Regions:
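Helical substrate-recognition/capping region of FAD-dependent monooxygenase/halogenase enzymes
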Residues: 10-258
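Functional cores that coordinate and move charged inorganic groups
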Residues: 2-8
Length: 258
């Protein structure tokens, strides 16, 4: 429902072409295939089809009494986890720039559902801070003087937020480098200047170590199934059909308290 709901809303508001709805099949068929796979494995475990499978099942049940790893084989919980959409068409894959670290140590990748973590500012949790109707940019930064890279990332994302006010908007959540945010920084493998772009259904659709406004605009255009022209000129963003729209004056973004 979340996957289809935000796409229908974007099309009805004129923020995306009808083609966005075609992505529902690609993304939900993947989830269905994953659920069928896990259900089949669970059924095979409950009713073994061979002597070897029965021996494995009985051994796991015996070990599960005393060992946690065996209990996870009995109840993996996989059917309660959101499906990763990694590799789907609406995502912007990583494209590290020269001199910038990659995301090799990150637990998340484009397509994965966002992870929660406590935040110092209201409402107190990362997922509760996300926009319920539009895209959200998570910007990891410190104080401007001590963290010029993170400060530039904030400026670039806020510029993109201003340009996107005419096309659905962009909420910006700044996550400062403080002890209360340590878990968020760790879960997102964040460094000063790291930016994650999240869809309305809370899936990661792009991420950067140092994003530009054009990066954010192009990634959102791709996530909305528009031709990702990005910025053709300063202050010019693609419209809902992927064509170049009229210049849009930069306006303040929607930002959470630092």
């Amino acid at each position: 429902a979340d996957n289809l709901g935000w796409k229908l809303a974007a099309v009805l508001r004129g923020e995306a072409p009808d083609a966005l709805l075609d992505s529902y099949a690609e993304e939900r068929e993947r989830a269905a295939d994953e659920n069928i796979l896990h259900s089949t494995r669970a059924t095979d475990f409950i009713t073994p089809k061979s002597a070897v499978s029965r021996l494995f099942r009985d051994a796991v049940l015996h070990l599960a009494r005393d060992h946690g790893f065996a209990r996870e084989l009995v109840n993996s919980g996989r059917l309660s986890r959101p499906t990763s959409l990694s590799g789907c068409a609406l995502l912007t894959e990583d494209a590290p720039r020269a001199g910038q670290p990659d995301f090799a140590g990150a637990a998340l990748c484009p397509g994965d559902p966002a992870l929660d973590a406590p935040l110092a500012q209201a409402p107190g949790w990362l997922l509760r801070s996300l926009s319920r109707t539009g895209f959200t940019a998570l910007v990891f930064a410190g104080e401007a003087q001590a963290d010029p890279v993170g400060h530039r990332a904030v400026e670039q994302v806020m510029q993109a937020a201003g340009l996107l006010q005419a096309a659905g908007g962009l909420a910006v959540v700044r996550i400062d480098a403080q002890a209360a945010h340590a878990l968020a920084w760790r879960r997102y493998d964040a460094r000063p200047g790291t930016v994650y772009l999240l869809r309305p259904d809370q899936h990661v659709c792009a991420r950067w170590r140092a994003a530009t406004a054009a990066d954010v605009l192009a990634a959102q255009a791709r996530a909305l199934s528009r031709v990702p022209h990005g910025l053709h000129a300063a202050g010019v963003a693609p419209d809902a059909d992927g064509d170049t729209a009229a210049p849009v004056a930069a306006r303040p973004g929607v930002a959470a308290a630092a």
